[in-house]
């Protein structure tokens, strides 16, 4: 079983990208399960030498990096629509990494924000869950804002199996999807409707839930804490 890990990154206005990205990458390469490839996509990262300096420290055979020549959402929204930027910034880069992963033969894809990180057992727990349940979509327990343990909405002991994603109900860095079985990408809802709807990840979970139900697929919540997202990395820049 092999995993693709997709990370999109950009040069933050607060200058914290190098330290946060290094923490994220360290967490990936410290995984106990090693059969993965990381696809890092620069969303028009302005100082590419800064990125090369960071990634030079990691195993190049497990690493793919590409810097896009344009940042579709940030170029469009940064000076005109901050809410659209926060909701949909990086969608094009994330989707680019997903499609690149699929074209390279990966179907189990994990999305990891460049300021989130995993505990060493994250991929191992997902692998075991998929082997035991044949789930097409899984997520793990996360922490969010000062060690707050984040559980999906309305979770009970009886809902671990066939747990369905929903908007606002999970941290997307805790999710792994089989994109061969669930061929859905992130969307810029504002670009489609000219209104601020659900953020890109929440929109994807709503569509994913419907797809899982309509196609009788299996989904699962892993009741183990393996993913971190907190205020240190939080930014709308």
Kindly give the residue locations of the regions a language model identified.
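Active-site-proximal specificity loops/subdomain of glycosyltransferases
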Residues: 51, 58-101
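Short, acidic, metal-binding catalytic loop of nucleotide-sugar glycosyltransferases
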Residues: 23-35
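Active-site donor/metal-binding and catalytic loop motifs
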Residues: 143-151, 220-237
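Acidic donor-binding loop at a coil-to-helix junction in glycosyltransferase catalytic cores
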Residues: 195-204
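Conserved donor NDP-sugar-binding/catalytic core segment of glycosyltransferases
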Residues: 124-152
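A recurrent flexible, glycine/aromatic-enriched loop bordering the glycosyltransferase active site
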Residues: 88, 158-176
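Short beta-strand/loop segment that forms part of the nucleotide-sugar
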Residues: 36-45, 66-70
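Short beta-strand-to-loop acidic/aromatic patch adjacent to the donor-nucleotide binding site
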Residues: 106-115
């Amino acid at each position: 079983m092999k995993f693709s890990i997709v990370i999109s990154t950009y040069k933050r206005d607060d200058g914290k990208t190098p330290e946060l990205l290094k923490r994220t990458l360290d967490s990936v390469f410290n995984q106990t399960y090693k059969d993965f490839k990381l696809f890092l996509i620069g969303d028009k990262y302005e100082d590419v030498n800064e990125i090369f300096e960071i990634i030079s420290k990691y195993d190049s055979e497990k690493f793919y990096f590409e810097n896009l020549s344009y940042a579709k959402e940030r170029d469009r929204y940064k000076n005109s629509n901050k809410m659209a930027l926060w909701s949909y910034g990086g969608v094009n880069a994330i989707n680019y990494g997903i499609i690149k992963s699929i074209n390279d033969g990966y179907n189990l894809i994990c999305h990891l924000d460049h300021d989130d990180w995993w505990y060493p057992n994250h991929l191992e727990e997902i692998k075991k869950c998929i082997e035991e349940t044949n789930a097409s979509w899984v997520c793990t327990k996360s922490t969010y804002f000062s060690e707050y343990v984040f559980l999906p909405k309305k979770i009970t002991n009886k809902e671990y199996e066939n747990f369905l994603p929903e908007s606002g109900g999970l941290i997307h860095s805790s999710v792994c999807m089989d994109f061969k079985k669930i061929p859905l990408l992130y969307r810029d809802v504002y670009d489609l409707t000219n209104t601020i709807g659900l953020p890109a990840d929440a929109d994807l979970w709503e569509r994913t839930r419907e797809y899982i139900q309509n196609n009788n697929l299996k989904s699962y919540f892993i009741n183990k804490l393996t993913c971190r997202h907190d205020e240190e990395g939080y930014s709308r820049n």
